Structures are given as structure tokens and as C-alpha cells.
Amino acid sequence: MSTPGAPEYSAFFGVIGASAAMVFSALGAAYGTAKSGTGIAAMSVMRPELIMKSIIPVVMAGIIAIYGLVVAVLIANSLTEDISLFKSFLQLGAGLSVGLSGLAAGFAIGIVGDAGVRGTAQQPRLFVGMILILIFAEVLGLYGLIVALILSTK
């Protein structure tokens, strides 16, 4: 895919794609972890026996960062000095795809996890509903990962 006549700056867009994949997905994971962790801390004062059961949103938020890491490593390993502008733009699109969808998924997981953990402490039957909603929020990040893998392997 490399082109000998590629502009000198073409690799820049691939590097930005790798950076965007990691930065935005890590921001989403950090927000999801912090927001869910706050709910767990508040809930555990009254119901400490539910702490381990309530850790699921934090784990799911952490998985979002792994999606970004996978794409960032794929992009970084395929960067060369003479990469074509087309390939570099594909890498930028892949990084933005997984990064921004990871940011959105992290926000959703954090908000749902916080409310779900607090609600489950009051009414244990809400646990299954919380898990289902968390799965739908996690899938948002997975969609971005799928699109990013398609783009980065072209």
C-alpha cells in the first residue's frame, strides 16, 4: 500500500488515528469507571455485601479502553515512513471510530452503572435490568471496534 511519491506528512494522520483511538477510549473508560465507582462507594456504606456484585460496570468500562488499545497497536504497527495518504486517512478514521464510540460507551456505562448500582442496593430485582442495559452500552464501543478493524485492515 506504500507509495514512493507519498507526501512527507502522510504518516501524521495515521499517528493521530492511533492517538485518538487510545485517548478517547481511555477517557470513556475513565469516566465510566469513576462514575460507577462513585455509585459503588455510596451504595457500599449501607450494603457492603453487594460490593463484589456491583463491580461489573467498572469491569465493563475497562474493556472499552482495551478496544482502543487493540486498534492503536494495529495502527502503530502498520505505520511506515512512505505510507500512502489513503492508508493514513483510513487509519485516522479507524482511530476516531473506536475512540469516539468508546467515549460514548464509557459515558453510557458510567451513568447506567451508577444509577443501576444504587438502585440494586434498594431493589435487588433491578440487577438483571442493569446488566442488560450495560450490555447495550458496551455494544456501542464494540460497533466502533468492528468498524475500526475493517478500516485499518484495508
Curated annotation (Swiss-Prot):
Residues 1-9, 76-91, 152-154 are lumenal. Keywords: Hydrogen ion transport, Ion transport, Membrane, Transmembrane, Transmembrane helix, Transport, Vacuole. The keyword Heme does not apply. Gene3D superfamilies: lithium bound rotor ring of v- atpase. The N-terminus is blocked. One of its GO terms (molecular function) is proton-transporting ATPase activity, rotational mechanism. The keyword Ion transport applies. It comes from the Eukaryota. Residues 33-54, 114-125 are cytoplasmic. It is found in: Vacuole membrane. GO terms for cellular component: proton-transporting V-type ATPase, V0 domain; vacuolar membrane. Its main location: membrane. The chain crosses the membrane at residues 10-32, 55-75, 92-113, 126-151. It is a multi-pass membrane protein. The record marks 138 as: Essential for proton translocation. V-ATPase is a heteromultimeric enzyme made up of two complexes: the ATP-hydrolytic V1 complex and the proton translocation V0 complex. The V1 complex consists of three catalytic AB heterodimers that form a heterohexamer, three peripheral stalks each consisting of EG heterodimers, one central rotor including subunits D and F, and the regulatory subunits C and H. The proton translocation complex V0 consists of the proton transport subunit a, a ring of proteolipid subunits c9c'', rotary subunit d, subunits e and f, and two accessory subunits. Belongs to the V-ATPase proteolipid subunit family. Proton-conducting pore forming subunit of the V0 complex of vacuolar(H+)-ATPase (V-ATPase), a multisubunit enzyme composed of a peripheral complex (V1) that hydrolyzes ATP and a membrane integral complex (V0) that translocates protons. V-ATPase is responsible for acidifying and maintaining the pH of intracellular compartments and in some cell types, is targeted to the plasma membrane, where it is responsible for acidifying the extracellular environment. This is V-type proton ATPase 16 kDa proteolipid subunit c.
